[in-house]
C-alpha cells in the first residue's frame, strides 16, 4: 500500500542511509586533503606522487568499505533492532552493506580526478550513474518495490566506481590488487565478525547483558586493524603523502 511504501522509504532515507554514510565522513575528509595535494603534484608534473597518493587512498578507502560492509552484513539486523527498534531498518541496513566499498572508493576517486582538473569526467560518470538509477526506479521499482530501487542504487554506484577506477588506471597507470586489498580482507573480516556474533549471542543468552556482550566488538576491531598492519595493508609512512 501507499502507507507501507512511504514508511519503508522513510526508514531508508531517514535511518538506514545516514548509518551507511556515516563512515563516509572519513573518506569525505580525505577527499578534502586529496584535492590540493593532487592538484599541486599534477601542476609540478610529479606523476610518481600522483600514482602513489592514488594507490594509498584507494587502498584505505577499500579497507574502510570492507570493514563497514562486514560489520553491517553481520550486525545489520542487530543494529536495526538495538538502535532504531525496527526490523525493517535492520534488513535494509544488511542489504545495503555491499554499497559501502563502492561508495567510499568513489568519493576518493572523484576527488583525485577533480584534482587532475578533469571535472567534466566526474560529471559525465555521475550522470551515467543517475541514468541507471532513474531507469531502475521507473522499470524495476513498480515490479519489485523497494528492492528494485536498492538494486538501481547499488548498480549505479558500482558503475560510477568502475568508471572512475578504469579512467584513473589509464591516466595514472596504477594497478589495484583486488585480491589483496578487497577479497582476502573481506573474507577475514566477515568470518571473524560472524564468529564474534555467535559468541556474543551465546554470551547474551547466558548473562542477559546485551550491552556488555557487544563490547566484545572492540577487541574484534582491534584484531582487524592488527591484521591490516601485519599484512602491510596500512602503514605509518602513508600519512606523509598528505603533508
Q: Which residues does each PLM region occupy?
A:
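Short alpha-helical transmembrane segments in multi-pass integral membrane proteins
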Residues: 53-74, 79-82, 141, 147-172, ...
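Membrane-proximal transmembrane or re-entrant/amphipathic helices at the cytosolic face
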Residues: 198-243
Amino acid at each position: 500500500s501507499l502507507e507501507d511504501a512511504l514508511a519503508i522509504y522513510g526508514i531508508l532515507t531517514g535511518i538506514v542511509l545516514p548509518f551507511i554514510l556515516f563512515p563516509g565522513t572519513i573518506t569525505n575528509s580525505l577527499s578534502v586533503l586529496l584535492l590540493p595535494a593532487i592538484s599541486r603534484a599534477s601542476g609540478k608534473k610529479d606523476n610518481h606522487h600522483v600514482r602513489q597518493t592514488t594507490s594509498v587512498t584507494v587502498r584505505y578507502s577499500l579497507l574502510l568499505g570492507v570493514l563497514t560492509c562486514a560489520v553491517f552484513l553481520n550486525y545489520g539486523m542487530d543494529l536495526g533492532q538495538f538502535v532504531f527498534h525496527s526490523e525493517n531498518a535492520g534488513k535494509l541496513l544488511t542489504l545495503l552493506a555491499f554499497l559501502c566499498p563502492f561508495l567510499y572508493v568513489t568519493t576518493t576517486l572523484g576527488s583525485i580526478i577533480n584534482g587532475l582538473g578533469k571535472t567534466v569526467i566526474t560529471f559525465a560518470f555521475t550522470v551515467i550513474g543517475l541514468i541507471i538509477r532513474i531507469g531502475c526506479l521507473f522499470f524495476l521499482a513498480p515490479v519489485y518495490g523497494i528492492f528494485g530501487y536498492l538494486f538501481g542504487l547499488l548498480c549505479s554506484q558500482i558503475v560510477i566506481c568502475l568508471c572512475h577506477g578504469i579512467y584513473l588506471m589509464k591516466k595514472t597507470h596504477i594497478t589495484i590488487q583486488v585480491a589483496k586489498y578487497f577479497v582476502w580482507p573481506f573474507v577475514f573480516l566477515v568470518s571473524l565478525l560472524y564468529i564474534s556474533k555467535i559468541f556474543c549471542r551465546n554470551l547474551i543468552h547466558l548473562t542477559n547483558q546485551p550491552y556488555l556482550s557487544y563490547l566484545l566488538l572492540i577487541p574484534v576491531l582491534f584484531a582487524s586493524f592488527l591484521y591490516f598492519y601485519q599484512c602491510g595493508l596500512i602503514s605509518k609512512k602513508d600519512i606523509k603523502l598528505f603533508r
